[in-house]
UniProtKB/Swiss-Prot annotation:
The keyword DNA repair does not apply. One of its GO terms (molecular function) is protein heterodimerization activity. Residues 207-221 have a biased composition (Basic and acidic residues). SMART domains: HOX, ZnF_C2H2. The lineage of its organism: Eukaryota, Metazoa, Chordata, Craniata, Vertebrata. This is Zinc fingers and homeoboxes protein 1.
Amino acid sequence: MASRRKSTTPCMVLASEQDPDLELISDLEEGPPVLTPVENARAESVSSDEEVHESVDSDNQQNKKVEGGYECKYCTFQTPDLNMFTFHVDSEHPNVVLNSSYVCVECNFLTKRYDALSEHNLKYHPGEENFKLTMVKRNNQTIFEQTINDLTFDGSFVKEENTEQGESIDVSSSGISISKTPIMKMMKNKVENKRITVHHNSAEGTSEEKENGVKASREENAENTSSSASESNTSTSTVNQVHPSPAGTVVTPTAVLPGLAQVITAVSAQQNSNLVPKVLIPVNSIPTYNAALDNNPLLLNTYNKFPYPTMSEITVLSAQAKYTEEQIKIWFSAQRLKHGVSWTPEEVEEARRKQFNGTVHTVPQTITVIPTHISTGSNGLPSILQTCQIVGQPGLVLTQVAGANTLPVTAPIALTVAGVPNQTNVQKSQVPAAQPAAETKPATAAVPSSPSVRPEAALVNPDSFGIRAKKTKEQLAELKVSYLKNQFPHDSEIIRLMKITGLTKGEIKKWFSDTRYNQRNSKSNQCLHLNNDSSATIIIDSSDETPEPPAAAASQPKQSWNPFPDFAPQKFKEKTAEQLRVLQASFLNSSVLTDEELNRLRAQTKLTRREIDAWFTEKNKTKALKDEKVEVDESNVGSSKEEPGENSPGDEAVAPKSAGTGKICKKTPEQLHMLKSAFVRTQWPSPEEYDKLAEESGLARTDIVSWFGDTRYAWKNGNLKWYYYYQSSNSSSLNGLSSLRKRGRGRPKGRGRGRPRGRPRGGKRMNTWDRVPSLIKFKTGTAILKDYYLKHKFLNEQDLDELVNRSHMGYEQVREWFAERQRRSELGIELFEENEEEDEVIDDQEEDEEETDDSDTWEPPRHVKRKLSKSDD
């Protein structure tokens, strides 16, 4: 026993040497060496670690028991410690491999290299991946026999036993593993078999090696060779546990690359279920099963929609797919067995009812959870992952892929799936430390009803369903701040908002567009400057704002009266006297509606948010109109001291007086002149133009923005009388005519115009800047119509729109005016009233008049002469 046999045939050779006479001999009768069970070994190279185990277990010539220790074949290293010997072989002889041969039974192909076998499979068995390798010993040489296996319903392969003349090794007791440096590992069976993965990837010529820790018993157990049921931490991949089955070893179809863990979908089962053997039925045992149906897209699509078709659906499928109903029924049954779908009749009816009443909308979800550190690797990853497919169920149960040095069986992860989301964040549970195999529970996939569902585990993008998602308060706050800065954001601002809010570019642009539209079309578009509080709320859609309880609102006392209501004013139900009293009291207290006050009014009056907001909007509008009327009256009384051009509706709408808003400064004539001139140039200034106006006029930028908004609104409603005057003066200055002196109508060329009476001679001319507002006289609407009538003598319908815009009169008013002229013409009476003609002459005179100091003569204007002549008569 202790003597060392001399052998001329080495058991281990370098990878560069390929000697066909090399052989691997297993002498079980000598008894294995005394080994210390390896637990918590280091997680090093799989190939290197397995080489040592192979060399120790399977070949006594390589490592003989030398005084209770181990001796290296290629150097003088000796040690009694297996771990030390393992480390030595890994570090000093990394290229040591075992001698083996490979035989393809189907083609009778023999080779010494695994790469050659892979090339053979790629050439003669293209697309075939269901290979089975059986290890036998023949003539003191280890041989791998490759056959093509049959697929069972659960996706596993049945591996037959091949024995050779009593020298072969029982396959059920052997764990077969292959890597790029092929190494055989012979293990003994103790209590239960291991479910091991062998997978050939023909493109890469690789397969994965499943390694189990080896324990050797003492001499009294030499007769009954065994393998420990517990796995050591040297395992870099995970194995599904199956229970004792004397029929043979079950090999799963899924294999993974080095360092890659197998995807396992698992839920806890009964602990005593490990006593029940798992029965695997080969597909070819069903005589009517037709494998051609597996690639039929119609059947696959139907199965994905619902795994239990009705008889009528089977009949339709039979007619469309050109297969018999019996074949289709068998195919659906096989698919359900294959994917582990087993529902009770009640569950089938419930799932069907949910599907047809709109609860279940989607095709089954296929979800694979892969750690980020291995999900980026290529290495044929998509083709070797076995995913878990859950059919017709709203709850999904899955576990994450186990990493290195871990076991895969964990508590299930439940999540809710609705539709096919673009973004799904799956919360992964932590994988616990390695547990003994005896405590591992078997895994089952596709549970019909999952009791534990965590909605927060899946974040679904609602855009994929066409549902408009509510914006959060943080998103709305960012959008409102940006809107107050610029109503037309640049691309850089949109990109910044996309990063901050997480919204899409289309959503952001639509929000800005809706806000501008609602602000422009709102009848309550009056800018209240609440002490320059830029935090005023802009409500675009009531669905974007979640009502808060009064207690929460009390801690945020910001002003939120909505100057831009989200919809046009609506007709609400009549309010009771008590409701009106409460609303009136609140309005008298403060015309600005805060969140706190709004919540209090909602609770007290039982009115909706929109009703209260609309009521306050209308009250503010009415109050602003009253204040404007009073101010106009005051300005008319003191017109000798004030400029009449300051009371245009577009200007008064800028700063309506309301209780609690503070003192709002009026704009000076110079400031108004600058704003009006800029408005004539463009109604939508750019941000740079706004800044320039603010710098030149001394007004706040928000005031200028508000003035332009209100003026645009007044212009749209035809309330801007000064617009055409500024437009004509702008066009004249652009054409270079502003410096030319105008002459009065009908005045002889040789006559000049004298200076007005009461003005000192030789005085300095008034500056045009100061003079323009006081000298502006506007033609009335009838004067414009009169000019048109004198020119054309009738109303041309093509010019109606232009006349309406210029005269600021309605369509019916213009038509009635021309009808009156026609009636007067037919009756032979005077076409125009005297005061109307006089006003028009005054307007023309004042419009054309320009003061000069170069005339020594003065004569009264024509309208004064006319009055004097009338008085003389």
